[in-house]
């Protein structure tokens, strides 16, 4: 049926192949920013992280790890919100791709709260309980199920208060919508290919819940957000 979730068929995205001209990559990253701004990506992240910030002691720095940061657009909107709330914050933004980090460096010049670190999401150079919150946006769908479970397990280990996974929801309707939208609003080859592929690479809410359980995450919620977003949030019971 059209309204049922299609089977997951993990395919590579062109951005992951890292062989496109970087001006084309930059243009595609700007498309991602627009998608996050107008299709709820930032809204979902800020909704959840605001709840963590409100419960954080005002006299202590709020320490965040952003996994697979890309252009660092997610840390930027988080820092903007923290500034509005007069909360002292530090965001460590991790990515394995040096080209991405060079691009992110240009974007965060006005954000001394953000610190870029090159490293592998599968083995980040951080110990247990190193951060108040770990966040990961539009990245989990790039990985196999086993890899995704390991990332959730690591996020749970590294965070003191919890973690936020903000990603796409696999569905035929979402695929059709983004396929049409990208043909209407962008000429970028990478965006036109990767956006529909991302939707079909994504997990469903039930799969997210199953993976969290497999990762040993004890206290979590999985919520759907319009349009076709999933928020997987872990909160420590003692937080």
Model-derived segments and spans:
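A short, conserved alpha-helix within the catalytic core of class I
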Residues: 143-154
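C-terminal alpha-helical "lid/dimerization" subdomain adjacent to the S-adenosyl-L-methionine
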Residues: 168-215, 221
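N-terminal auxiliary segments of SAM/dcSAM-dependent transferases
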Residues: 1-18
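Core SAM-dependent methyltransferase catalytic element
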Residues: 221-239
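Class I SAM-dependent methyltransferase SAM/SAH-binding core
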Residues: 65, 71-123
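A conserved beta-strand element that flanks and buttresses the S-adenosyl-L-methionine
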Residues: 135
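Conserved beta-strand signature within the Rossmann-like core of class I S-adenosyl-L-methionine
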Residues: 159-168
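Class I SAM-dependent methyltransferase Rossmann-like catalytic core
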Residues: 18, 22-53
């Amino acid at each position: 049926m059209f309204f049922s979730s299609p089977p997951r068929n993990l395919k590579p995205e062109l951005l992951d192949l890292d062989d496109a001209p970087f001006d084309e990559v930059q243009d595609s990253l700007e498309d991602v920013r627009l998608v996050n701004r107008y299709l709820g990506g930032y809204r979902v992240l800020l909704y959840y992280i605001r709840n963590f910030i409100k419960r954080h002691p005002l006299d202590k720095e709020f320490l965040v790890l952003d996994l697979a940061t890309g252009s660092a657009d997610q840390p930027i909107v988080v820092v903007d919100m923290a500034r509005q709330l007069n909360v002292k914050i530090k965001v460590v933004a991790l990515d394995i791709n040096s080209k991405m980090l060079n691009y992110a460096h240009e974007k965060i010049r006005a954000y001394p709260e953000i610190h870029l670190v090159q490293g592998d999401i599968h083995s980040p150079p951080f110990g247990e309980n190193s951060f108040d919150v770990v966040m990961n946006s539009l990245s989990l769908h790039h990985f196999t199920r086993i890899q995704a479970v390991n990332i959730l397990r690591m996020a749970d280990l590294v965070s003191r208060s919890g973690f936020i996974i903000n990603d796409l929801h696999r569905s035929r309707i979402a695929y059709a919508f983004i396929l049409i939208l990208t043909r209407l609003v962008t000429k970028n080859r990478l965006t036109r290919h990767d956006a529909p592929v991302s939707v079909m690479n994504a997990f469903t809410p039930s799969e997210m819940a199953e993976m969290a359980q497999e990762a040993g995450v004890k206290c979590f919620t999985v919520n759907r957000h319009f349009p076709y977003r999933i928020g997987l949030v872990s909160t420590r019971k003692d937080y």
